[in-house]
Amino acid sequence: MKTIIISDFDETITRVDTICTIAKLPYLLNPRLKPEWGHFTKTYMDVYHKYKYNGTRSLPLLSSGVPTIISQSNFNKLFADELKYQNHNRVVELNSVNEITKQQIFKSISLDQMKTFARDQNHDDCLLRDGFKTFCSSVVKNFESDFYVLSINWSKEFIHEVIGDRRLKNRHIFCNDLKKVSDKCSQSYNGEFDCRLLTGSDKVKILVKILGEILDKIDSGCNKEGNSCSYWYIGDSETDLLSILHPSTNGVLLINPQENPSKFIKITEKIIGIPKDKISSFEADNGPAWLQFCEKEGGKGAYLVKSWDSLKDLIMQVTKM
């Protein structure tokens, strides 16, 4: 069976949030650059508190009133409050990147400088989570057509270089990309952001768009294997939850509870609402490497998974590869 992977980038493919890494580049190139990055951190928090969400965020997402099976017909109704909450967060994120644009922090940095920086930061694949490359070689049979990145990161060039597989198509990377300008010799950033991908509600819209484009290829006869495809969305954070729960894919929350226990408990227990007995079982040292926590139509599901190696085993079991 053909496996289509659509994955978040930061802290899913990588060990850390690399937006913080990218933020170092302008100051490495120009140590006298002002304002310092702390200005933007403060701006973000000021806007966050100013535009604090006053609506209803119904938590946990999977309350006792949620039907057993998530479907195309009930998804928008079930998660209407979460969609509104995530969409509201666009105000905060947009104000943040607009301030970075206003101060021209990334203006005139060349794409080649970003690529070199990414390779330097990822020496010996130090930014990649263990097992990611093995997963890709074992599970993704045609990386060129079957692997997508869906991220709120700022640079396609950075993402491409860190993943390090030349078969990854630029048009398969979706992110809050820095805009480019070209001259006769090279391309550089103009300091502005694309701003189409800022929040979890943006992510789920683009997820649906990606899946629609894949199905269009199937309908047009470009993809002969389409009817036997298995679709997977993989993420690690709150901005991934709507995509993880969407009925079109098998969804994966890729978190190791031993490595980040506070994040794990917040997302699984407080936000999603996974029963404590399931969480306790998964947390244990000798606990399962993966655990299904909800069902979707068509036999799909949403899963807790500890590592890329565990995800490889899960997909092989589900698809009987």
Where are these regions (language model features)?
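A short, charged/proline- and glycine-enriched loop
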Residues: 1-3, 227-228
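Alpha-helical substrate-recognition element adjacent to the catalytic core
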Residues: 2-177
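C-terminal cap/substrate-recognition subdomain and adjoining C-terminal extension
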Residues: 123-148, 153-321
